[in-house]
Amino acid sequence: MRFTAFLACLLVAAPAASARQDLPTLSPAQAISQAASASPKSVRALFQFKVQSAAESRGGYYLDSEKDFHSAANLGVSIRPSAMPGLTKKYGDDLKSAFVGKTIKLIGQVRRVSVGQKGGVFATQVEVTHAGQILSVS
């Protein structure tokens, strides 16, 4: 019985791990280009970059690949409140200190999102809804 349960766990976990390995790892420039080409659809991938800035927002957090989050070259990571408990447990309450200046690797879907009240201005973002999407910080 235990062996059967163990095999069942392996069968469930193995496809998820291999699917992660099959995803490309994109730089911010590659992510922005692919999101623009696929818009309005999103692109699932791994993303890796050095965090240049971070800010709290409405119970969540934003991480940016550029110091100026308005930059067209910026890849933003929108961390939703649902991910905050797991992230603060793992990295502490001061996420800004935990991430800024460090290289992060995460899994998710990148897309162009309309920002501002007038529309016509877009940002490229990856949404993090659970802490497990952030795979490494170094």
Indicate where each model-derived feature is located.
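Positively charged n-region of N-terminal signal peptides that target proteins for export
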Residues: 1-5
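N-terminal signal peptide c-region/cleavage motif recognized by signal peptidases
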Residues: 13-16
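OB-fold single-stranded nucleic acid-binding module
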Residues: 20-138
